[in-house]
Amino acid sequence: MALPKDMRLKGHRTFNYIHKNSIKYHGKLMTFKVARSNPEILLSHNHTNASNNFRAAIAISKKVSKKAVDRNKIRRILQEWLITNIPKINSHKPYWLLVNLKFGDFCNDKNKLLEEFQNLMFKSRLIK
C-alpha cells in the first residue's frame, strides 16, 4: 500500500531543503534525514493541503538491488510500516523524513530491516 498523498514528499526543492537543513540519524542498514517542515516549498506544487503535517520519502538506490521489483518491495514494506504505526494523532508533527537505504541484501531479511527502521524512528523521536 502506498503512502497517502498528504504524507508524500515531492519536488527537487523539497529534497534540496532536506539535504541542507536536516538532522541525520545513521544505522547499519539505512540513514534517516529529518528536517522541520517548510510548507512554502510545497506551494509551488499546487498542493491544496500544504500544512505542517508529517511527510516522508523513501529513496532506494540501485546499489541496494539492481531489480526494480526488489526495490519496490522494500519500499512497500517500509511504507506499510509507516501507515500502520504513524497514527492520525501523530501526523501533526511538523517534520519531513527522508529514508536512504545503504547497500545490502534486504529481500531475505524483512525483520532485520523493520527492526532497524523502528529503532531509527524512536531514535529520531518521530514516534514514542
Swiss-Prot record:
GO molecular function: 3'-tRNA processing endoribonuclease activity; ribonuclease P activity; tRNA binding
GO cellular component: ribonuclease P complex
EC number: 3.1.26.5
GO biological process, one term: tRNA 5'-leader removal
The organism's place on the tree of life at top rank: Bacteria
Pfam families named among the record's database cross-references: Ribonuclease_P (PF00825)
Catalytic reaction list: Endonucleolytic cleavage of RNA, removing 5'-extranucleotides from tRNA precursor
Top-tier EC class: hydrolase
Family: Belongs to the RnpA family.
Record text on subunit structure and interactions: Consists of a catalytic RNA component (M1 or rnpB) and a protein subunit.
The name this protein goes by in its record: Ribonuclease P protein component
Organism, as annotated: Prochlorococcus marinus (strain MIT 9312)
